[in-house]
Amino acid sequence: MGQYVAPIRDMQFVLHEFLNVTEEFKNLPAYQEIDADIINQVLEEGAKFTQEVLFPLNHSGDREGCHFDAATKTVTTPKGFKEAYKQYVDGGWAALGCDPEYGGQGLPVSLNNSFYEMLNSANQAWTMYPGLSHGAYECLKEHGSDEQKAQYLPKLVSGEWTGTMCLTEAHCGTDLGLLRSKAEPQGDGTYKISGSKIFISAGEHDVAENIIHLVLARLPDAPEGSKGISLFLVPKFLPNADGSLGERNPIFCGAIEEKMGIHGNATCQMNLDGAVGTLIGQPHKGLNAMFVFMNAARLGVGMQSLGLTEVAYQNALVYAKDRIQMRSLSGPKAPDKPADPIIVHPDVRRMLLTAKAYAEGARAVCSYVALQIDRELNHPDEDVRKEAAGEVALLTPIVKAFITDNGWIATSEAMQVYGGHGYISEWGMEQYVRDARINMIYEGTNTIQSLDLLGRKILMDNGAKLRAFGEKIKAFVEENGLDESMSEFVTPLGELGEKVGKMTMEIGMKAFTNQDEVGAAAVPYLRVVGHLVFSYFFAQMAKIALEKKDSDDKFYESKLATARFYFARLYPETAMLIRQARSGSANLMALDADLF
């Protein structure tokens, strides 16, 4: 069903030419031995696995879905998923970006990130089984006790066990302060946890022998609200001292959800009836610990939409070159055929270029953020680590919300290229649209990401993170402002930077008297800032392409054309968005609720 070819050439461009990661790695002691050959080899081997093993299971997994056995409370994944997971584990892919102390290969986040894109292009639903495990690994690595780390991290790193996060309950999604699950202390340092969780991705399955659930619950003396939530490690099977599986813990799947998309992943209702767990971190500080998992998941969701955008674009492009319909408006382009390929039609090209631009822009941004994580975690200079952490915090909601919004747009446009055939399941395009839709919802809705960006990441620190990033943009604009060949990119970039600064100040002043101004402006505001980031990166990539314009490699010609399309056709929506963000809250809040 369709095709997927990992975009290795563009990944290499981003890593080697745009980010020059091997030079960056020289300043990171853990990665000084990572060279271009290692990077390229990982990309090539990752492409083989995702193209040959995972992609063939994508459409069949969507058709078959997961099967729940109410009698045994077990879930069977689609045909081939379990075998593919074994190949993934046997190939060492689970350990790629993990700490060697726990059996990992210790490769950079920025390299693992590219492989993760391939996984999501090939099969998003399957990728969620190991993908969530990495978030559990990060959370335990930072907040787990020495005993928890020793007992669980090697198994998570190897892929023998998988992980989940259990946050949501029927009455509380975004507002976790309403959470009701309870944890009763036992005399031996463990806790018995009771409650019900919903929407738990990969909560029950057959691909691994054990599942490590990270569960939010309240202790008996917990304060009300979000300040009274603790985090617990609750394994499906309680491990014995030697690491073998012991007693079955009473945390069971009660049902799996019927969903719009990601049918190959089990979205579970999980019931805990006195399940044994151990505390992660400090009592009542569970959200602090869980945010390590959640932030990793938010970046991962952006990668999911990047992956879907890429594979949808690839298939739409093949179709547009093969499908013949009508003649070109400017005269026949294939006179030997009864009609021209539809790629000659301007609006078909608009749809294709929209997906292409959103894929290439997202790849650059996600790779940049991954490199900043490498710097944050490994650079010997504390100031550099702090700067990198600030950029990761600023850009995480952009990756989660802007890229997933774009993924919905891009997969829809790619399906539209097919006309009526795109709406038919056998072509596979409608699956990408269905799968992409959840990415705007889970791991914090895109509205919540917008509030996080404007309210917490920008206004709460008086715009310090945004200004620091803006200084980089300003320096680039000043450096290239006199280069006529760059004016079509640098001029709009500089103008948007100034507009974002003024808009931020205006919204901040309004918020002093009415906090609804933040909520009213947040969604269009995030999209404007997303375009600012994309504009900055497209301008930099265009500069590289211009420097290689005399090359025989047509890749650079394509890269330059994509940047020009972005600034001509996608960037202009910022004018509308700025007007929306500045329009105030009255047009939303004045109408009485009874009059809706």
Residue map of PLM features:
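Amphipathic, small/basic residue-rich leader segments at the start of a protein or domain
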Residues: 1-127, 147, 151, 374, ...
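Alpha-helix capping/hinge segments and adjacent helical runs
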Residues: 2-5, 185, 262, 368, ...
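Glycine-rich cofactor-pocket loops
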Residues: 31-33, 63-77, 289-300, 314-355, ...
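Internal maturation/activation junctions in enzymes
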Residues: 130-133, 144-186, 370-389, 407, ...
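A short core secondary-structure module
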Residues: 190, 194-248
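A glycine-rich, basic-preceded beta-loop-alpha segment at the flavin cofactor/substrate interface
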Residues: 199, 237-254, 259, 266-297, ...
